[in-house]
C-alpha cells in the first residue's frame, strides 16, 4: 500500500488497500482513519478530484463505516457506524 500526498488543506495523505477495499486518510493532525468497504472507483475519483477536500466532505464523510487507527498496543477504536 502506497501513501499519496493529498495536496489538500483537509488532509495530508491517503492510501488504498485493494485486498480489503479500505481507504486510509492521514489528517494534518497526524490521526489516521480507515474507511471500510470503500469502492476502488471512488478512490480513483478522489485521486482525480479537483478538490480532494471537497470530494471527501461530499462523498466520504459520514457515509462509510470507519475507525481511527491508534497506537498498535491499544488497537483500533470504532468511531462511526453507518448502520450497515
Report each predicted region and the residues it spans.
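Acidic/histidine-enriched, beta-strand-rich ligand/metal-binding domains
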Residues: 1-84
Amino acid at each position: 500500500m502506497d501513501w499519496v500526498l493529498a495536496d489538500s488543506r483537509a488532509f495530508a495523505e491517503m492510501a488504498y488497500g485493494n485486498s480489503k477495499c479500505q481507504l486510509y486518510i492521514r489528517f494534518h493532525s497526524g490521526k489516521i482513519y480507515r474507511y471500510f468497504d470503500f469502492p476502488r472507483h471512488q478512490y480513483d475519483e478522489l485521486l482525480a478530484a479537483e478538490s480532494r477536500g471537497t470530494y471527501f466532505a461530499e462523498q466520504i464523510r459520514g457515509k462509510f463505516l470507519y475507525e481511527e487507527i491508534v497506537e498498535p498496543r491499544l488497537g483500533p477504536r470504532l468511531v462511526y457506524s453507518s448502520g450497515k
